[in-house]
Amino acid sequence: HLMYTNKDGVAVSGPDSEGFSPTESYRRAVRTLFSEMGNNKEMIFYRLDNAAGTMQYDRMPNRSGNTTNYRGGSLLGATQEMVDAYFMSNGESPISGYSADGVTPIINEKSDYVEEGVSTAEYKGIDGTLYAPVGTRMMYVNREPRFYADITFSNSKWFEGTEGGYIVDFTYSGSCGKEQGSNDYTSTGYLVRKCMDSGDRNQNLVCVLLRLTNIYFDYIEALAHVSPTHEDIWTYMNMIRKRAGIPG
């Protein structure tokens, strides 16, 4: 079955359980330490003890003051188009496309997406996890849980733990910015966080090659081709969306 945990990685029975964390459930289903995978019944095919230091280096901020194993290269930058592709918390897409210039977004009015300004209150997940502190650009507030598991943006919070729990600052003179980073800084203003572990960058990780969600998606796609009105399409799609904290 799909993996459901609270914010500490402790298994819960489902998405309606007290303490359920869509962000942590999704993050741990994708990749983490083997010692933290005991609750993951979703894995079908995987590799143990993968030397993932380079992958984690690419995804970890180059934060001034952190020691080597907790300081990355800020190399794998997510694009704005990738960021725009994530839903809002209400399940709506923030934009419906781009204007003729290919850059200016066309705001989806049903999404409650706000492009300009900064937040005046903390934005937290249903499990109490801080997603966006005060002063975060509004375009990163009120997004779906997977966004906060997959994307590191300026003013986002890095994982708790040794040399963690800090607020990421990608501005030019910020703690993770270009001035102190020399060549190791994000060129897009974002980092990919997906598949990143919460510990140091030299830990060996489980590489999940096939998980139950992939099987569900393959089943959904097959039905869409041969029986597009089959009720299982939305049964399994909504199962996946609910685990991710997205309305069905």
Model-derived features: positions:
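Acidic/polar-rich alpha-helix caps and helix-coil junctions
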Residues: 1-80, 86-248
